[in-house]
Amino acid sequence: MESDSEMVPFPQLPMPIENNYRACTIPYRFPSDDPKKATPNEISWINVFANSIPSFKKRAESDITVPDAPARAEKFAERYAGILEDLKKDPESHGGPPDGILLCRLREQVLRELGFRDIFKKVKDEENAKAISLFPQVVSLSDAIEDDGKRLENLVRGIFAGNIFDLGSAQLAEVFSRDGMSFLASCQNLVPRPWVIDDLENFQAKWINKSWKKAVIFVDNSGADIILGILPFARELLRRGAQVVLAANELPSINDITCTELTEILSQLKDENGQLLGVDTSKLLIANSGNDLPVIDLSRVSQELAYLSSDADLVIVEGMGRGIETNLYAQFKCDSLKIGMVKHLEVAEFLGGRLYDCVFKFNEVQS
């Protein structure tokens, strides 16, 4: 289901890719494991995906763009649950052994085969509209902070607070359907520092020197995440003279923002002079990443993104799927930042942190 045009490796990955890059962070199995027997880790993660089936089924049932949505949603739940059971019995079935990317891909495949293209569209539209109305307030609160380092920390907290809006997490989907998400309250209620990975001071030191000329940001969710988290941060980078490329999914997957949706949101936020609350956006570009999942394998990105990223000196991978469950340990030829909130207990345990802990992993490349 990826982009029809040929996919290429992300140019900031060191070559050869096969020796230097592995997308998935958490190993579900080791070479010594029996290939015919599911490992405890595989079973645990298959169960994480199984637990999300009811919330996906519920979204699919109410998709008004699909005829017979309730019956098809039931079929989705049965088919995907069947695939997960098959993988427990034989980890080599369905293109296995399973990892986070395969389990996501199989779920999307079943949804799309049944005609479900974008089951989270309604909630994405609602959350985008809410976040757009809050954008000026969030930016003016940030702009009022005079100290560069403190303003950066405030913007980073905004990214974490926005990143809570993740309907791929079964637990958060339940919280969300019960009482929604309050962005400003979330900013105040982050787990206290130090976070499970906390390189904020090192990043701040480099930030204050205005050292980056071009940043590529792999974005994550719709709503507060992109609009109140990433865009104020990107606007600050623009204000400091950097060029910014926002890399978004080509096709819908859970409540992640797509390239088309992001273009539309930016056109609503910009004024008649093309400014984002007083900041020129001529150096802000939106790129189609070529991806269609909530995780990302950077050995396969669109040619458009590869072309725009070849001279980047900062790569930011945001969100639990792209920046923690995949790519946390990815090395790049330039400086990199992985930033996201831990929203699965299994990830928290792997990292030795707490649920809803924050990851801020900065790697500086010595020139």
From Swiss-Prot:
Name of this protein: Damage-control phosphatase At2g17340
GO cellular component entries: cytosol; mitochondrion
SUBUNIT field: Multimer.
Cofactor binding, note field: Phosphatase activity is strongly promoted by several divalent cations but it is suggested that Mn(2+) and possibly Ni(2+) represent biologically relevant metal ion cofactors for damage-control phosphatases.
Binding site for Mn(2+): 220-221, 256
Residues modified as N-acetylmethionine: 1
Function (record text): Metal-dependent phosphatase with probable damage-control functions. Shows phosphatase activity against several substrates, including sugar phosphates and p-nitrophenyl phosphate(pNPP). Prefers sugar phosphate substrates, including the extremely potent glycating agents ribose-5-phosphate and erythrose-4-phosphate.
Organism: Arabidopsis thaliana
Domain text: Subfamily II proteins have an EGMGR motif about 50 residues from the C-terminus. This motif lies near the metal-binding residues in the putative substrate-binding cleft 2. Subfamily II proteins occur only in eukaryotes, in two forms: as a stand-alone unit in plants, and as a C-terminal domain of pantothenate kinases in plants, animals, and chytrid fungi.
GO MF terms held by the record: ATP binding; hydrolase activity; metal ion binding
Motif (Subfamily II EGMGR motif): 318-322
EC number(s) recorded for this UniProt protein: 3.1.3.-
Stored InterPro entries: ARMT-1-like_metal-bd_sf, ARMT1-like_metal-bd, At2g17340, At2g17340_3_helix_bundle, Type_II_PanK
Regulation of activity: Activity is strongly promoted by Co(2+), Ni(2+), Mg(2+), Cu(2+) and Mn(2+). Activity is inhibited by EDTA.
Alphabetical keyword list: Acetylation, Hydrolase, Manganese, Metal-binding, Nickel
Recorded superkingdom: Eukaryota
Biological process annotations from GO: coenzyme A biosynthetic process
Names of the cofactor(s): Mn(2+); Ni(2+)
Family: Belongs to the damage-control phosphatase family. Phosphopantetheine phosphatase II subfamily.
Signal peptide: none
